[in-house]
UniProtKB/Swiss-Prot annotation:
The C-terminus (head domain) is involved in binding the cellular receptor. Its main location: virion. GO terms for biological process: symbiont entry into host cell; virion attachment to host cell. This is Hemagglutinin-neuraminidase. Residues 48-616 are virion surface. Residues 234-239 are annotated as: Involved in neuraminidase activity. It comes from the Viruses. It comes from Newcastle disease virus (strain D26/76) (NDV). Belongs to the paramyxoviruses hemagglutinin-neuraminidase family. CDD domains: HN (cd15469).
Length: 616
């Protein structure tokens, strides 16, 4: 019995012990849960205090800023990569190509000279300073985006005058011609001793030189060889070209007035001459009876020629024999070029009739005045293998003075505005098999020339005229695909008289800010322009050789006007008719008059207008 009671008591003690430990475990679990909840609540409270809603809103902004910094850093690296690529893949090969081209030109020139030395001619090898390598005869400004007229000429810069001037009051220097190759330049003008109207006898000055850079970095033209052709030959209307053998020149030998020449039955005598690197001049008469058998008068175009495919190409114009094969081939052909935004109001049939008549002006007895291009093989023999190209009058206007230019790989032909169309014309030119082909021209509406009514500067309708003045444009601004965008030149900014020379950069419609030679009453005549770059400084310069009135020593003085081409934010001057009104926001660069001022400006201007308009 006691044993049974003890057994029951033992079981009760064990059950109470189990219940006690179970209670302890439950209390421990409960306490642990409470502690965990407390810690979680504290952590949550701390977290809420650290990241407020405003902080969460700012997170995207912070991410964006970081993204911008990363993008900027990557973009900077990309710019560096692009510049490296441009330098390695584009600029370096181009620089090497330009250097190679200059070296090859120099070697070609030297090889000709060595051959000449073998023939006992003896000569030196001229070449421009290294600063100009790759900066002559190239596309100087290649820009697809900038406004062409944001480029403009500086004030005229003082430099060494390489052109001789008259030394007496009756002296006259006129009709400049200039051409520059990668190795040297050539220049010529006519010298008349007894006034510019004397057509009986004249000299021809011819010079060969190179571009130099002074110790202070200034550009100057250095004449190395020159000659004054003072003999019994009356050379006129000469065109010059820089070739590997020196300075090639084409001239007419004139013994009568232009009107008398057109009324004659035989072509005008012409001569192909050359000033060699040794300073010796030689020339040869061309067989004009064969070469110009369909012509009654023929003259070089005054403007420079160009060396292309081992031939020298000269501009030529003159009168055709009526009913000759060349004349018949042009019968009924004409072209009408129109002014920008200024349409001729005449009936179309009347315009066509007047356009056709413009090729046969009454001044020359109704002869057809024709444009042409003459190419001659450049060799030690003068006048070798001459070939005459006569372009169709469905492309060219009435024949006139002109110039052949090469810039980069492109060739151009400038035609003086002697007919009704006042804006400057620049025809793209291609050559093949010794002949040239002219294509539809670039026109520069603001680059006009003065002319007699009805072919004055603002003229817009076809008419029969022989007027204007030689003022050639030089191709300056190009697209990257080599298409021409703009030109530099010095124009005479007057409606009718040869007055007011100004330099500017021109696009097809308008012109840049201008640089004046002097006052608006300054008399001037022919201008010819050429641009180049000093590669070392990356500065572009343009030279305008201009005939300027000079009442003290001679009636005209030929002045080489040098400007640097600058760039602004694209200010331009619009033109309708005349461009003599200044636009607000800019002013002309006015240079102090370089020649004498007249006391009686009113009477002086009247005389100037009458006198200037009388020049051919």
């Amino acid at each position: 019995m006691d044993r049974a009671v003890s057994q029951v008591a033992l079981e009760n003690d064990e059950r109470e012990a189990k219940n006690t430990w179970r209670l302890v475990f439950r209390i421990a679990i409960l306490l642990l849960t409470v502690v965990t909840l407390a810690i979680s609540a504290a952590a949550l409270a701390y977290s809420m205090e650290a990241s407020t809603p405003s902080d969460l809103v700012g997170i995207p902004t912070a991410i964006s800023r970081t993204e911008e910094k990363i993008t900027s850093a990557l973009g900077s690296n990309q710019d560096v990569v692009d510049r490296i690529y441009k330098q390695v893949a584009l600029e370096s090969p181009l620089a090497l190509l330009n250097t190679e081209s200059t070296i090859m030109n120099a070697i070609t020139s030297l090889s000709y000279q060595i051959n000449g030395a073998a023939n006992s001619s003896g000569c030196g090898a001229p070449i421009h300073d290294p600063d100009y390598i790759g900066g002559i005869g190239k596309e100087l400004i290649v820009d697809d985006a900038s406004d062409v007229t944001s480029f403009y000429p500086s004030a005229f810069q003082e430099h060494l005058n390489f052109i001789p001037a008259p030394t007496t009051g009756s002296g006259c220097t006129r009709i400049p011609s200039f051409d520059m190759s990668a190795t040297h330049y050539c220049y010529t003008h006519n010298v008349i001793l007894s006034g510019c109207r004397d057509r009986s006898h004249s000299h021809q000055y011819l010079a060969l030189g190179v571009l130099r850079t002074s110790a202070t970095g200034r550009v100057f033209f250095s004449t190395l060889r020159s000659i004054n052709l003072d003999d019994t030959q009356n050379r006129k209307s000469c065109s010059v070209s820089a070739t590997p053998l020196g300075c090639d020149m084409l001239c007419s030998k004139v013994t009568e007035t232009e009107e008398e020449d057109y009324n004659s039955a035989i072509p005008t005598s012409m001569v192909h001459g050359r000033l060699g690197f040794d300073g010796q001049y030689h020339e040869k008469d061309l067989d004009v009876t064969t070469l110009f058998e369909d012509w009654v008068a023929n003259y070089p175009g005054v403007g420079g020629g160009s060396f292309i495919d081992n031939r020298v190409w000269f501009p030529v114009y003159g009168g055709l024999k009526p009913n000759s094969p060349s004349d018949t081939a042009q019968e009924g052909k004409y072209v009408i070029y129109k002014r920008y935004n200024d349409t001729c109001p005449d009936e179309q049939d009347y315009q066509i009739r007047m356009a056709k008549s413009s090729y046969k002006p009454g001044r020359f007895g109704g002869k057809r005045v024709q444009q042409a291009i003459l190419s001659i093989k450049v060799s030690t023999s003068l006048g070798e293998d001459p070939v005459l190209t006569v372009p169709p009058n469905t492309v060219t206007l009435m024949g006139a003075e002109g110039r052949v230019l090469t810039v980069g790989t492109s060739h151009f032909f400038y035609q003086r505005g002697s007919s009704y169309f006042s804006p400057a014309l620049l025809y793209p030119m291609t050559v093949s098999n010794k002949t040239a082909t002219l294509h539809s021209p670039y026109t520069f509406n603001a680059f006009t020339r003065p002319g007699s009514v009805p072919c004055q500067a603002s003229a817009r309708c076809p008419n029969s005229c022989v007027t204007g003045v030689y003022t050639d444009p030089y191709p300056l601004v190009f697209y990257r695909n080599h298409t021409l965008r703009g030109v530099f030149g010095t124009m005479l900014d007057d409606e009718q008289a040869r007055l007011n020379p100004v330099s500017a950069v021109f696009d097809s419609i308008s012109r840049s800010r201008i640089t004046r030679v002097s006052s608006s009453s300054t008399k001037a005549a022919y201008t010819t322009s050429t641009c180049f770059k000093v590669v070392k400084t990356n500065k572009t310069y343009c030279l305008s050789i201009a005939e300027i009135s000079n009442t003290l020593f001679g009636e005209f003085r030929i002045v080489p006007l040098l400007v640097e081409i600058l760039k602004d934010d694209g200010v331009r001057e619009a033109r309708s008719g005349r461009l003599s009104q200044l636009q607000e926001g800019w002013k002309d660069d006015i240079v102090s008059p370089i020649f004498c001022d007249a006391k009686n400006q009113t009477e002086y201007r009247r005389e100037l207008e009458s006198y200037a308009a009388s020049w051919p």
